Amino acid sequence: MSIAHNMMSSGIKEVNFEDFAAGLKAVLTGAQPEVSFEEAGQLLDKYFAALEAEQKAQMEAMSAMMREEGEGYLAAKAKEDGVVVLPSGLQYKVLTEGNGKKPSATDKVKCHYEGTLLNGSKFDSSYDRNEPAVFGLNQVIPGWTEGVQLMSEGSKYEFYIPYDLAYGAHGAPGAIPPYAALTFVVELLEVL
C-alpha cells in the first residue's frame, strides 16, 4: 500500500499491472527482470519528463485563462457607474464615504474586509471571524496599499484588483490561483 501511495503522490497515473507485478516478483525472488535497473530508471525519467511537461502545459493554460478572465472582468467593471479606474489598474467603487483620518502607506490600520475570487467564492473574511484585522499598509498586497490610502476612517469601498496588484503569478497556494484578479470589500475602521 505504501508503494501505491508513493506512486500516486509522485504523479504516476497509469500502471501496467502485469509488467509491474512481473518486475516486483523478479526483484523479490532474485530472478532476472525483463528490464534492467538502468533501463527502468531511463523509462521512469522519460515518464516523469512527459508528466512534468503535461503539468506545465496545464498550468500555462490555466494561467492564460485566469489572466483573460481577470481582464474581461476588470474591463466590464470599468464601465459600471461609480467605478473609478486608477492608472495602476486598480479599480474601486465607494459604498460609504467616511470623514475621518486617511492613512499613509506606512500606517497601521484596523479594517473589516471580505475577499472573493471572480467566481464569487470567498477566500477570506474578517466579518466571518467577527474580528477586524490590524496590519501595516506596507505589509499587504499592492492593491490594498494603494486603495486603502484613498479611504477615510468610516469609509467602505469595493476594490477590483488586477492580478499584478494582488498575488501575482504565484497566487496564494490553497486559496488564490495564479494570475487571479480579486474583489475586496474593505471597511476602514481606524488609522492607528
Which positions does each model-derived feature cover?
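Cross-family detector of peptidyl-prolyl cis-trans isomerase
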Residues: 1-192
